[in-house]
């Protein structure tokens, strides 16, 4: 089969690789009909994620048709149309029983590797390093899905792929981020970033009762999408000081909730800390660039909440924990427990409360994947979200 494979920093290729096979009796094989490039895939593309190996198959936002099931799979059959969550979860461990699916104790075969870096191992993730399981990803023609009774959700309606594909990751991720923000009716929420996840954060904030949503970015097309589709007020951080503007917009109090939907590759408009972060990364003296998280902590009102769906992979320098502590902030974060949200969010799509396809700007063939990575990474051609059709 054809697959998009990682071969190093900025080096993604279309390779011919063996088709996946049933390994465990709880596996299923899915023929991919649509798959997406995620913003967190760019952390791999940019070389930020350790334990990647040349030839690793990328991708964790897939859907398709079940073509084979293991002998112990009971909920799926050949021909079923499914969306596959990016997290791989067993369904029966301590954490899965608490619906903390991204904390699954069972699904990561390289748990010892993850423990050395994190203290404990999270769940395995498709196409996202050997530290997180070394699983082949979904930017391919076929995908092996472990624990197939636990992960995939069946799509029984005639909704097109583009409307349901993002149940695999970014819609649940945006929704959980808004949920983690502990929004109360009428709250003002500031969202850093206007990429694909942030667009669903914005939509979800309204669903959960926000009174105002303020979106912060510098890319015109992304700000426009946040304003037109997300009905958000916007701040271009290259044109205005974010802290000063947020204070002016909130009568000096600050937003009730701040959401970092950017993560480890944050940019700043020439601020000293942002420049220093980039210099440290260039000299291999640091990993993540936490400018946005610092700014969110400083801007959030006293007693407020900072939600962090943005991905971080290593250590953060000069995080203002004194400000967070003395302001009494709550910080909530984590990989998304996708399986928890699949049914209720699918229901919202089926009831026309939201059409997730609004975020798609580019729909391409799998062979165009390498160029699509570059276009997405460089924010060229108005690119916000790429869907690949094998």
Curated annotation (Swiss-Prot):
Single Gene Ontology MF annotation: S-(hydroxymethyl)glutathione dehydrogenase (NADP+) activity
Q: Which UniProt keywords apply?
A: Metal-binding, NAD, NADP, Oxidoreductase, Zinc
Cofactor note (record): Binds 2 Zn(2+) ions per subunit.
Q: What is the lineage of its organism?
A: Bacteria, Pseudomonadati, Pseudomonadota, Gammaproteobacteria, Methylococcales
The encoding gene: fdh
Positions bound to Zn(2+) 1: 38, 60-61
Q: Know the name of this protein?
A: S-(hydroxymethyl)glutathione dehydrogenase
Functional description taken from the UniProt entry: Oxidizes long-chain alcohols and, in the presence of glutathione, is able to oxidize formaldehyde. Also acts as a S-nitroso-glutathione reductase by catalyzing the NADH-dependent reduction of S-nitrosoglutathione, thereby regulating protein S-nitrosylation.
**Does the entry feature the keyword Metal-binding, yes or no?**
yes
Q: Which organism is it from?
A: Methylobacter marinus
